[in-house]
Amino acid sequence: MFNPAILVLADGSTFYGKSIGYQAVSAYSIGEVVFNTAMTGYQEILTDPSYAKQIVTLTYPHIGNTGTNDEDNESNQIYASGLIIRDLPLLHSNFRATSSLSDYLIQHNIIAIADIDTRRLTRILRETGSQAGCIYIPNENESLAQAVEKAQDLAKSFGSMAGKDLAKEVTCQHRYEWQEGIWHLPTNNAGKPFNLQTTPTFHVVAYDFGIKQNILRMLAERGCKITVVPAQTSAEDILALNPDGIFLSNGPGDPEPCTYAIQSIRQLLNTQKPIFGICLGHQLLGLAVGAKTRKMAFGHHGANHPVQDLKTEHVLITSQNHGFEIDEYSLPENVIVTHRSLFDNSVQGIELTNQVAFSFQGHPEANPGPQDVAYLFDKFINAVQATKA
């Protein structure tokens, strides 16, 4: 039995639906409401730390068809503050499924709403930009008008993502090592779905600003021993680990308040060790070389974003998840733009001309989405190999 639920945006836009997650009356969740156009991958989206403090609207109408499983998580918990969908199927079916989407949300105490007009909501967000919002489960002692007013007040209390340093909130507390490679279908019941890299060739230190596990798997699959370190790790501590290369991960929030990371990256750039950044790591690399970042109106969230590699002129379909971008006109002379969005011409990749350091705004590791940009991992490994030789 699903309880009634409402979604109210900070501007007062109101939607009525049913609660498909955590069911307690008077429960609520607040965050920045964004929309994602991916047709699949809802479990990966929910567990992506980049969605911390965000309520995710999935524009594809049928969500939950394949249930959830124990292998598709991108972290050890759900980081999205809430989920908004149009229709939740009554049945789920997939040979890997261990739970329904609703049961998965309830298990993790995540508030979610279904049966609302997600097309109307998406149009509002496109026209006004991302807004704070609140999913609220009314109680029987309050009128609907009272519930809406309360939810709007809660939404307004969230404020803006600008100025929020969320990397410190989602990062690991202690460094750890990673050896697990990419997923594959086991050939028998005793097989393991993930390869273990037992004879690594390179040592990469990865900053965890909210790192997705498939990024680590892509590096491990290419022969890397990965040491994952907390976001506030100093450059001196990084160098003490004697890495062959340095990776700057994805993550949530505004990059500008992450001054600790920007300072460390600046120092690491002086070492000539290869550096590769993704998403938030891309923005932090830009800030470290003197560029500026800015908040986007509604960001890029989806698995079908066309991006052009300016060197090869190839068009790549990419997975995207970010609400901030590098201001191209603030880039210094020693930085070139390598990739550009074909949706809005925003900067999607940069590279330093005087050392081995480059980054990409989207997600070459996908999960969910295409792997057209996975070659950037190979580029990083080739740079590590050349530097080590």
From Swiss-Prot:
Pfam family, one: GATase
Assembly, per entry: Composed of two chains; the small (or glutamine) chain promotes the hydrolysis of glutamine to ammonia, which is used by the large (or ammonia) chain to synthesize carbamoyl phosphate. Tetramer of heterodimers (alpha,beta)4.
Binding site for L-glutamine: 50, 251, 253, 280, 283, 321, 323-324
Region called CPSase, residue ranges: 1-199
Entry-linked InterPro entries: Anth_synth/Amidotransfase, CarbamoylP_synth_ssu, CarbamoylP_synth_ssu_N, CarbP_synth_ssu_N_sf, Class_I_gatase-like, CPSase_GATase1, GATASE
PROSITE patterns (UniProt xref): GATASE_TYPE_1
NCBIfam families linked to this entry: CPSaseIIsmall (TIGR01368), PRK12838.1 (NF009475)
Reactions catalysed: hydrogencarbonate + L-glutamine + 2 ATP + H2O = carbamoyl phosphate + L-glutamate + 2 ADP + phosphate + 2 H(+)
Entry's EC annotation: 6.3.5.5
Keywords recorded for this protein, A-Z: Amino-acid biosynthesis, Arginine biosynthesis, ATP-binding, Glutamine amidotransferase, Ligase, Nucleotide-binding, Pyrimidine biosynthesis
Active site, renumbered: 279, 363, 365
GO-annotated biological processes: 'de novo' pyrimidine nucleobase biosynthetic process; 'de novo' UMP biosynthetic process; glutamine metabolic process; L-arginine biosynthetic process
Domain Glutamine amidotransferase type-1, residue spans: 203-389
GO terms, molecular function: ATP binding; carbamoyl-phosphate synthase (glutamine-hydrolyzing) activity; glutaminase activity
This protein's name: Carbamoyl phosphate synthase small chain
Family annotation (PANTHER family): CARBAMOYL-PHOSPHATE SYNTHASE SMALL CHAIN, MULTIFUNCTIONAL TRYPTOPHAN BIOSYNTHESIS PROTEIN-RELATED
Pathway: Amino-acid biosynthesis; L-arginine biosynthesis; carbamoyl phosphate from bicarbonate: step 1/1; Pyrimidine metabolism; UMP biosynthesis via de novo pathway; (S)-dihydroorotate from bicarbonate: step 1/3
Function: Small subunit of the glutamine-dependent carbamoyl phosphate synthetase (CPSase). CPSase catalyzes the formation of carbamoyl phosphate from the ammonia moiety of glutamine, carbonate, and phosphate donated by ATP, constituting the first step of 2 biosynthetic pathways, one leading to arginine and/or urea and the other to pyrimidine nucleotides. The small subunit (glutamine amidotransferase) binds and cleaves glutamine to supply the large subunit with the substrate ammonia.
Origin species: Haemophilus ducreyi (strain 35000HP / ATCC 700724)
